[in-house]
Amino acid sequence: NKSETTYLSRYYKYEGAAWYSRNIEIPADWKEKHIVLFLERTRPTTVWIDGREVGKCNYLSTPQEFNLTHFLAPGSHKLTIRVDNGKSIPGQIRSSSHACTESTQTNWNGIIGRMELQAMNPLFIESIQAFPQVEDRSVKVKITLSNSSGIGGKKLQLSASAFNTAKKHKARSAEYNLKEGSKEYEFTYQLGDNAVLWSDLQPALYQLKAEINGIDEKTVQIGRAS
């Protein structure tokens, strides 16, 4: 046996497909919920529910999410995940990327970190993008909702506060009306004249929260360069 001391070593090396399967139970109160399979970190995957293919994902450095809503009803189901650290990863990445090389983390196989089935309301905040505008101390906020039906009359609230600065600042919250049939929105949210600016010596950050009252909320961090 050859001993290796210049990088990580393993008892066994494997490249190819690995299969993981287990029975899951969906509770009755998840009926009509939006259900997502969340895999925090893995290799290229294919997912099946009860033998029906849900989809594929090849993310290596970010979480993978699969929408299982139309595959799961309350009751028993079989979840199967195929993870492939072989030819599903391009050869150049396998041979030279820090995500795969023996001198860093190796070309491991499997699923690590959080592995969850997440159930949420059919209406939720799918994404939020924030673009600080230094000139008028505002933030352009782009929001995408999960769907556009059943939202008429509901409101979305934006709020923001500095959280890592000696000088505290909390912007005045603002409410916006949601329109039936619209799932994408763009707002200009004012932080106020006393908003704290980001610099390399004082990297002031804000937590910007978007909330649909009693339904869902999402928070992102932003900074406004001086």
Please annotate each region the language model reported.
Residues R10-I125, S148-S149, H169, V220-I222:
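Accessory beta-strand-rich segments of carbohydrate-active enzymes
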Residues V47-I49, S138-N177, K183-F187, L208:
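Beta-strand-rich binding/interaction modules
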Residues P63-H70, K183-D193:
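Exposed aromatic-hydrophobic patches
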Residues P74-S76, G153-K155, S182, L201-L205:
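Extracellular Ig-like/FN3 beta-sandwich strand-entry sites
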Residues K78-I81, Q202-G214:
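Short, aromatic- and glycine-rich surface loops/edge beta-strands on solvent-exposed regions
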Residues A119-G150:
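Surface beta-strand/loop "capping" patches
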Residues K168, G214-E217:
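Short, exposed coil/turn segments at beta-strand boundaries within extracellular/luminal domains
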Residues A225-S226:
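Conserved small/polar residues in nucleotide/adenosyl-binding loops
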